Amino acid sequence: MSDKSELKAELERKKQRLAQIREEKKRKEEERKKKETDQKKEAVAPVQEESDLEKKRREAEALLQSMGLTPESPIVFSEYWVPPPMSPSSKSVSTPSEAGSQDSGDGAVGSRTLHWDTDPSVLQLHSDSDLGRGPIKLGMAKITQVDFPPREIVTYTKETQTPVMAQPKEDEEEDDDVVAPKPPIEPEEEKTLKKDEENDSKAPPHELTEEEKQQILHSEEFLSFFDHSTRIVERALSEQINIFFDYSGRDLEDKEGEIQAGAKLSLNRQFFDERWSKHRVVSCLDWSSQYPELLVASYNNNEDAPHEPDGVALVWNMKYKKTTPEYVFHCQSAVMSATFAKFHPNLVVGGTYSGQIVLWDNRSNKRTPVQRTPLSAAAHTHPVYCVNVVGTQNAHNLISISTDGKICSWSLDMLSHPQDSMELVHKQSKAVAVTSMSFPVGDVNNFVVGSEEGSVYTACRHGSKAGISEMFEGHQGPITGIHCHAAVGAVDFSHLFVTSSFDWTVKLWTTKNNKPLYSFEDNADYVYDVMWSPTHPALFACVDGMGRLDLWNLNNDTEVPTASISVEGNPALNRVRWTHSGREIAVGDSEGQIVIYDVGEQIAVPRNDEWARFGRTLAEINANRADAEEEAATRIPA
């Protein structure tokens, strides 16, 4: 590195020397031109003086003519008169001898010679007695004054806007050379400078030693630069633009049927990393509320790679067509749940199998957690399957629940000790083994949880009835997913929630009744997750162990799903998450792959009457359930 800097310094010194030589040549040339100009001025000076005299004479003649006098008319001033100008042939120039003889005459006034300037021409003054003419009488003359207004000069300005062309300094110097050419450098000096520059350019770069290379590779500045730059380069290389897209719509003729159906699911993206995703199970998915294109996915341990970290959380980017994760985080315990910290766009929260809550920060160059909760009785000691940030910008908490029924409330600024903790116990019996949790929209106190024994519970965090409130029975297997109604509209459906279970069913519930409103039984395997659409009131999605994604629009049909698609290879789908816009949906499988699907507009975007239609659908469901209960009641006595 030092040799390279010395070469650069030597080249700069030579360039400065070349500039000094050019400046010296330019100064000498200017001095030479100045001397030549002075000599020319001295040679032209007499001619200019003569021309000035002629100009003065013409002005005098013009003045006399304006007064009514002609140059031929002599003007008498006392005893002298001025003759008109004579031709060079008729001029009489008196010599000193003649002057002397005239002065020695009989007392007459002799001729006098008047020298106006250095010009050899002479004006002679004669007495009146020599020519015998009398004096001329002068009189007053009328003067007519004429004013000529100055010529009016009309100007206008015209401007044209042109783009500014930024030129480097070298180009500006070249332009200056074109306008004012510099004196050429002597061939010998120019050749010497060119040879030096060529030698400097051809000089081989300094070869770094292995120790220097390792020092650079492990420096903090290089790691930060490399991490940032590779992310940008990957985005640029992964972009694929369809240059053959036809805006006239001819390309869509073959897809006319699908467009009219509007309920098709189309593949958008697939996320998979050979090192961090292979042989790992996707345990949780979550979309960022600050950056909607970012998706965090948590992964279980890889049994085929015992030396790799057990827990991994990858942040994927939907905006760019890159195949690698935006961020890679890991810890020493399998990550069972993960979420973006709402109101903190740089933080990712994870719940681990060991019971620790870990916190990653994408502003840090470390892939390991920047904070973690202690492994003590004050916190969790069982697997944490549920983490969620609830509250507002100025008052929010991290809520976590472990499988031993313990719920803790944390401040993201301090994870050393929970702010509040509570045991979820139903009627003083054993603790509830929570597997899933969901908060209604806008509620931070009341929530619902699913358990391993198949029961669903409502609970609250504060108040006189803190803890488990009611129990809902209906599933015949462990609850795998639970989600409260999320679409906000003209009618409030926040009392509704759906659950999925190992009993191959999805059930619709209301907090107003401890029996399920409806049971969706179209699946032939475990249903691992379920989620309401964030924008459509009657739409929810579920995934099962056969690799099938189902979309149910209850306003259209309650017996069969509105749209279904199976992932290639039919891996078990563990998690499903809608984007905040409701136009895309992400699913994670048991092989570590994440698939993003685009949802058709006619099924994803609700019409204005969807809330009213869903209200009528619920009324029909309640009526059918009441009829079924009455029929069952009549059959029991028989």
UniProtKB/Swiss-Prot annotation:
The keyword Acetylation is annotated on this UniProt entry: yes
Q: Which Gene Ontology terms of cellular component type are present?
A: centrosome; cytoplasm; cytoplasmic dynein complex; cytosol; dynein complex; microtubule; vesicle
- Could you tell me which residues belong to the region Disordered? 1-135, 155-214
Just give the chief location class.
cytoplasm
Q: Where in this protein does the record say Phosphoserine is found?
A: 51, 90, 97, 101, 104
Question: Compositional bias (Low complexity) spans?
Answer: 88-97
Single GO MF descriptor:
dynein light chain binding
Identify the keywords attached in UniProt to this record, alphabetized. Answer: Acetylation, Cytoplasm, Cytoskeleton, Disease variant, Dynein, Host-virus interaction, Intellectual disability, Microtubule, Motor protein, Phosphoprotein, Repeat, Transport, WD repeat
Post-translational changes noted in the entry:
The phosphorylation status of Ser-90 appears to be involved in dynactin-dependent target binding.
Q: Looking at the keywords, is Transport present?
A: yes
Q: Where are the WD repeats?
A: 277-326, 330-370, 379-420, 429-469, 474-519, 522-562, 568-607
User: Could you tell me which residues carry Phosphothreonine?
Assistant: 95
Q: Which residues carry this modification: N-acetylserine?
A: 2
Q: Which residues carry this modification: Diphosphoserine?
A: 51
Q: Where in the cell is it found?
A: Cytoplasm, Cytoskeleton; Cytoplasm
Please note every region of biased composition (Basic and acidic residues).
Answer: 1-13, 20-43, 190-214
Could you tell me the Gene Ontology terms of the biological process aspect for this record?
Answer: microtubule-based movement; transport along microtubule
Q: Which PROSITE patterns match?
A: WD_REPEATS_REGION (PS50294)
Please name the InterPro entries in this protein's record.
Answer: DYNC1I1/DYNC1I2, Dynein_IC, WD40/YVTN_repeat-like_dom_sf, WD40_repeat_dom_sf, WD40_rpt
The entry sums up its family as follows: Belongs to the dynein intermediate chain family.
Disease field reads: Neurodevelopmental disorder with microcephaly and structural brain anomalies: An autosomal recessive neurodevelopmental disorder characterized by global developmental delay, severe intellectual disability, microcephaly, dysmorphic facial features, and cerebral malformations including simplification of cerebral gyration, agenesis of the corpus callosum, and brainstem and white matter hypoplasia.
Task: Please explain the role this protein plays, according to its UniProt record.
Answer: Acts as one of several non-catalytic accessory components of the cytoplasmic dynein 1 complex that are thought to be involved in linking dynein to cargos and to adapter proteins that regulate dynein function. Cytoplasmic dynein 1 acts as a motor for the intracellular retrograde motility of vesicles and organelles along microtubules. The intermediate chains mediate the binding of dynein to dynactin via its 150 kDa component (p150-glued) DCTN1. Involved in membrane-transport, such as Golgi apparatus, late endosomes and lysosomes.
Relate the assembly described in the record.
Homodimer. The cytoplasmic dynein 1 complex consists of two catalytic heavy chains (HCs) and a number of non-catalytic subunits presented by intermediate chains (ICs), light intermediate chains (LICs) and light chains (LCs); the composition seems to vary in respect to the IC, LIC and LC composition. The heavy chain homodimer serves as a scaffold for the probable homodimeric assembly of the respective non-catalytic subunits. The ICs and LICs bind directly to the HC dimer and the LCs assemble on the IC dimer. Interacts with DYNLT3. Interacts with DYNLT1. (Microbial infection) Interacts with human adenovirus 5 hexon protein; this interaction probably allows virus intracellular transport.
Under what name is this protein listed?
Cytoplasmic dynein 1 intermediate chain 2
Which species?
Homo sapiens
Lineage of the native species? Eukaryota, Metazoa, Chordata, Craniata, Vertebrata
| Gene this chain is encoded by | DYNC1I2
